Amino acid sequence: MKLGDFEIGLDRPFFLIAGTCVVESEQMTIDTAGRLKEICAKLNIPFIYKSSYDKANRSSGKSFRGLGMDEGLRILSEVKRQLGLPVLTDVHAEHEIEQVASVVDVLQTPAFLCRQTDFIHACARSGKPVNIKKGQFLAPHDMKNVIDKARDAAREAGLSEDRFMACERGVSFGYNNLVSDMRSLAIMRETNAPVVFDATHSVQLPGGQGTSSGGQREFVPVLARAAVAVGVAGLFMETHPNPAQAKSDGPNAVPLHRMADLLETLVTLDRAVKRAPFLESDFN
């Protein structure tokens, strides 16, 4: 699959989607994106910067949601202009899609909305690549129906069907907890869409702090290594210069100063894994 200026897939080195959870300020966004660009250039990692202009599903109605759609998109456009990076952001409603698609390179659908057929169809008709997150309530094989919805809508609109990614972000395991079943990464390959693993939301503890979500960022390296060992097309990770001060999802964000070491380890593992054949089909 072609994503911007690079090809993605299981036969390619992993690509990275990374950035802050939400756009907090222009300066922090540019600084964070610039540092990630430096790291990824050194490690030869294809990189897409991500950040949200709005967090529509916060635990509390009083939580910070962002700087607003217009300002958030303006700042993301500055990332593109100043740093030459492709950008991704999530959309939350059909009426937002046209404006967002005019700015960003990749759309993302929130996990909670993966079963909303009209919404998936509208994203698919945007003409943009779409990273479709698997809901925390969904079995991995159910993603085939979701990807098929997107492809059907694209085909009916006369657009490429080869623009959709399936993203694993953990599954609900009791109250306020998520677990990652690494089998899901292999199962989701059956969609014939590139599979992305979200290593930071997978360690989230949804609503775990009452009015906000908790998280266990110490397990991000563990799950990221496991996903790369299984074999993925891409990784998604949120990071922040100071997670303790982050306005959204700080407990599961990787400290920015730790990203280089983590990614270096993951690149080494990815190279080793993808030199060998994937044997799942031989065991049937």
Curated annotation (Swiss-Prot):
Single GO MF annotation: 3-deoxy-8-phosphooctulonate synthase activity
Source domain of life: Bacteria
UniProt pathway annotation: Carbohydrate biosynthesis; 3-deoxy-D-manno-octulosonate biosynthesis; 3-deoxy-D-manno-octulosonate from D-ribulose 5-phosphate: step 2/3; Bacterial outer membrane biogenesis; lipopolysaccharide biosynthesis
One GO term (biological process): keto-3-deoxy-D-manno-octulosonic acid biosynthetic process
Main subcellular location: cytoplasm
Gene3D superfamilies, sorted: Aldolase class I
EC number: 2.5.1.55
Subcellular location: Cytoplasm
Enzyme class: transferase
Annotated Gene Ontology cellular component terms: cytoplasm
Listed name of the protein: 2-dehydro-3-deoxyphosphooctonate aldolase
